[in-house]
Swiss-Prot record:
InterPro entries: POLR3C_WHD, RNA_pol_III_RPC82-rel_HTH, RNA_pol_III_Rpc82_C, RPC3, WH-like_DNA-bd_sf. It comes from the Eukaryota. DNA-dependent RNA polymerase catalyzes the transcription of DNA into RNA using the four ribonucleoside triphosphates as substrates. Specific core component of RNA polymerase III which synthesizes small RNAs, such as 5S rRNA and tRNAs. GO terms for cellular component: RNA polymerase III complex. This is DNA-directed RNA polymerase III subunit RPC3. Component of the RNA polymerase III (Pol III) complex consisting of 17 subunits. Residues 593-614 are annotated as: Leucine-zipper. GO terms for biological process: termination of RNA polymerase III transcription; transcription initiation at RNA polymerase III promoter; tRNA transcription by RNA polymerase III. Keywords: DNA-directed RNA polymerase, Nucleus, Transcription, Zinc.
Amino acid sequence: MDILSDIKASVKGAPAPQQNPAAIKSENGNVDVSVSNEIHQQTAASTEELMSVSSLEQRTLHAEKFLYTEVIKSYLGERASTVISLLISLGRLTVREIYEKLNFTMSIDSIRRTLVSLTQLRCVRYLEEPKRGSAKYNTYYYYNKDGVYLLLYSGLIINDISSRFSEQKRPIVAEIIQNILSLGSLSLNDYLENVTYNIPKHEMSGLFVELCEMGFLVRLTKFDYTPIKDLWNLLYEKEYNQLPRNSTQSDLKKRTEAKNKAKTEFHNLMEASTDLSKLIKLDPSTSLRTVIPTATLTINIKRFLKSRRSLQLTNYARSRVGPVSAQLYKLALKLTENKAPYFNDILSETGLLQDLDELTAMSDEMELLEEKSPGVTFTANDILKIVPKNYKIENSLVYEKKSGKRSQNQEKSANTKRLKTEDGFVIPSLPTDNNHSNEKEIDDAEVEDGINEGDEMDADSVSIINSHLKILASSPVPFLKETQPNVYYIPYSNLIPELKSSIYDHIIVSTLGPPSLRIRRCIKENKLVSEKVINGTALMKEKDIRTTIGSLIKYNAVEIQEVPRTVDRSASRAVFLFRCNESHSYNFMKQNLAWNLANLLYKKEKIEDENKTLLMKANRDDVKGKERELLLPSELNQLKMVNERELNIFTRSFRLMSLWEVFEFF
């Protein structure tokens, strides 16, 4: 009996449920991925009218739903997209309920095969609950964002992880990650049985060990398929029911005690997948560390998002303190990336944030983890050890400004009278004693420099790096904080709000213009202002101010606050003030970016559908490489246009993703 079944049995008082074969595997015991071959199959017209995202109205109702369904459709096809759309719109459903909601247009077997593929790729979670008055169980399915994120970032994940290895290992690592992404999970034994590279097994096992130590691969457990809120509720009910009923404690104290115990057990269950001591062991035949061959491994999306956070902070530092300090800051982020805490406590996904005390406690705990966790602090010596050899930091600091005035020595040398012979030859001046002494000092110091050159260069490099770290720590934006003299850590809790604000301001400037940012900053600085105050501080025409405020209100960057002047709250005598609500503004911007990103995926799909025949012809084996000979000029022009539009869509998608992820994850 596993832990989850034990929890359910203790809560419900029922026997532990058996695993539903339709939840994970098909009838023959093998994982079914046949949904990927059904991309172009369509459902009935009534279902398509209900769930399709082809109309503008349906696409704008729920931006995240539009994005998730488009991502699923591009990878798994129309049927998988339809099922995910239902789960997002209606919440948890059983197979029978999905069958009824689709108006019986898909068979139950087809729905189960679709759910198997979605579950395998971590796009769906499930939970088994006992039926009332029966020993049978219902399996409820939920949509899971983690699988959608893995599909959306699949190319970037492969590129980011493989770039951390040497050139010889990059193709092998890229193949490992690609196989895990395409299958959802993979064990070491399964990969070694089908490996295409002719390398020793212990070297391949060493790559898996490195990926696990970096945090990119974690053990797949049953809790990865269990909804977080339901797991928390089961743990809480279990701890509450175990408290003695005849206790004299109040119900509030009992609930608090049960909550604290459930938190501890919840964290232990969530951290079990990242515990390397239970995943890596010594191989008795080679005495080398290896991953447990039967352990099922999957991609840790949170670890990858840490690297995306580091990239965003590096670009932000480059715009604030310059490229050299930003490069050293990038090394500091890379050094502490694996040990740094995640973006938020996983308990925030359980609904506990409805309590203000819980929110404050989580925020304080995150700030404490950023400073006190092992491996998150560093010094200049730590940075020097990982500085690339081809990266030069000498002469990267200017300690004092050069004066525009000429020195007295320069004036004297310029005013000295030069002697010439009859032929016009200039007689050089005689060397002074100072020149002789300087040359002698240089000659004497050459030997000492040869002996102590390495130590002096290291000392100078440490001093320069430490100066750059102090620049980052003393910046108005808190890129670093100093816990002890010359010991630093990265305060993510204070830094991420600054990053969000900077990117939001950049979007406002690029879309609505600089006057919009000026007025928004005026409102944000004064918190709650009237139009009269804005007219006096924004230094703009009154007509332009009203037009700009209207645009800001339209994009939810500024809100209107009604302040009544009378007791009866008469609208005719009320005053309307303006304010900025950052949480509302950021959420609106996130929805806007998500819709634009999904719309690009939708346009790409439409382009491929419109040119389906041409693309099939160009992708034939007998046509590849001979397009100019076998295709008509009009077909070549059309194919060129399709490639250019797809390339443009990919470029815009990556740019939108870099903006959207700041408001979605950070």
